[in-house]
Amino acid sequence: MNLKDKIDQKIFHLVGEAADAVGQPCYIVGGYVRDIFLHRPSNDIDFVTVGSGIGLAEALAGKLGPKTRLAVYRNYGTAQLRYRGLELEFVGARKESYHRESRNPIVEDGTLDDDQKRRDFTVNALAIAVNADNFGELVDPFGGLDDMRRRIIRTPLDPDVTFSDDPLRMMRAVRFATQLDFEILPETFDAITRNRERIAIITRERIAVELEKIICSPRPSMGFVLLEKCGLLELIFPELHALKGAETKDGRGHKDNFLHTMQVLDSVAEKSDKEWLRWAALFHDIAKPVTKQYDQQHGWTFYNHNFVGKKMIPGIFKRMKLPMNEKMKYVQKLVELHMRPIALVEEEVTDSAVRRLLFDAGDDIDDLMILCEADITSKNPEKVKRFLSNYQEVRRKLVEIEEKDRIRNFQPPIDGDEIMRIFGLSPCREVGDIKERLKNAILDGDIPNEREAAYKLMLKVAAEMGLKQVEE
């Protein structure tokens, strides 16, 4: 098959001319070729040449002119450059062999055939020639094009060898299946299950990268369900695995919290591309297994699972090498607060409760509401309808009170420094108590969020404490 019409762009002709000039066969390989057939945009282009990848890149840079910036990585035998928004990478064809204790291969110079054999999956083992004499010719020794048409993920060689040599490929198989909505061939999936313990030699950082790509996919639950089925999830994310299953006692059961979490995750993904909102969906019930109890009166309960879940998150993030920064705190915040709107819809929606929710959620209130609405997964359509209707009332109240009271991220009109100055105080408990009284009075609607009202209340509270004003 010839694909010259698919690659009829100036850059490919320039690379081909440079390859001819140095006397080396050169091919476009990897994801860019795959994405041509899947009609997916891509700005990253990998080239393999039989010979020196660095030498070819240097020849191309010479053709492009003195302003071209070439990055050379001699230890890896690769070179990179940018061209009109495209990221180009060049490497010489290689063959690889592995030691069992490491995923880092022993690398030797090889042929195009050797290079294609070392690829993870057939859909990534396609190559398109760019030399003048065979420009556009597709090289597909493992039936990758047919696998794309069949929408399957399959390894070019024995999958047991492929996954044992580089266990990260097990995560990549799940990730590609999720991103592309492909099926992992049963023989390939069975090999993942057999080799799952080999994931232990992969660094947590590399696993985290794959998990992030899964969670950013259009239907992220697909990836986590596959990880659960093959046994990888229990090894890399045991807390999520622990959600699986529904227990019954005295004829009373609870929902499978793993499947529920998957529904919530997909529902959030339909409404938002925010990666860390999706992580919050994944974590929102993470503490249910450790808070689960049964009593005759109430059946199954998970009291305080939102607070316990918040406390679990830093340890999980640290172990999984997820960012221990504001992103983690955001996830903690949504996990802690995700029960609050539910409590509101089950009771009368009071202004005071809405003010406190606005204050605690701040700028993340909209994300919190997306998560909470996704959390309604009852099989009872009337219950779902009722809850969603109540949520609309909560949203209406949020807008109304936000416009009226400016509560989101508010600070009381009088701060601690002013309180200390007015009453001649150093930092002390009384200052904090006055600030707390002012905050609660505003949130409870006892006084408006205005300086004059806050000032009067401050004087009253201070007088009750026996404090005297030293400055007007």
Walk through the language-model features, giving the residues of each:
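Catalytic cores of the polymerase beta-like nucleotidyltransferase superfamily
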Residues: 1-472
